[in-house]
Amino acid sequence: MQDTLDLKGTVGQFLHEYKKALWDSYDDEDMRRDATFMDHYGSAQKEGFGIAMKKGIGSVNSNNQRIFDTDIIVYRYADVLLMMAEIENALSGKCANYVNEVRKRAYGKNWHPQFAYTDGSYADNELTILHERDKEFVWEGKRWFDVVRMHDANGKSLAFSVAANYPNNETPDERVPLIKESEAHKLLWPIDVNTLNNDPKLEQTPGYDK
């Protein structure tokens, strides 16, 4: 494969397994998509779709060396806006303005009112905020905490929601939740065996064998 990302042979491409459905969820006018991913196919027949991530690869200096000078992301302004959207939705308020402020920056010169979100039901708003976070915070370690924290209209974690997940590349018409309700214990991590052995008073997280 050619060095399309200009990595200078230092680390290779970030070929994490991001689903095509996530790529497809971006509008063509949303500049985050092409700033985050590079799409590629396995053949001229457009088969074997895949995406390589372009985030966090740094830059090349005058000595032709790759420097990882990307800031370590903790919280960004877009995160604050979407937190506010989440809070407003929880309080039965209006969240669309916060979502649209994030989108306006993301679309830049491509922005058009047709891309604006209009407030809907609690469940619709919650899913919209989640999917906006999905597109905004790729590779930033937030997705799992988002789906566990956020809820549907019945107060159930979005980790159990089919609508919150993306279909697999191999079965694009089949949608399943991230976690089955029969495996609800997976919302919490198990305690590793070394820690349990070192402290006999510890008890394993319910749902896992000790």
Question: Where in the sequence are the language-model features?
Answer:
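Polar, glycine-rich mid-to-C-terminal structural blocks
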Residues: M1-E17, L22
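Acidic/polar-rich alpha-helix caps and helix-coil junctions
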Residues: D27-K210
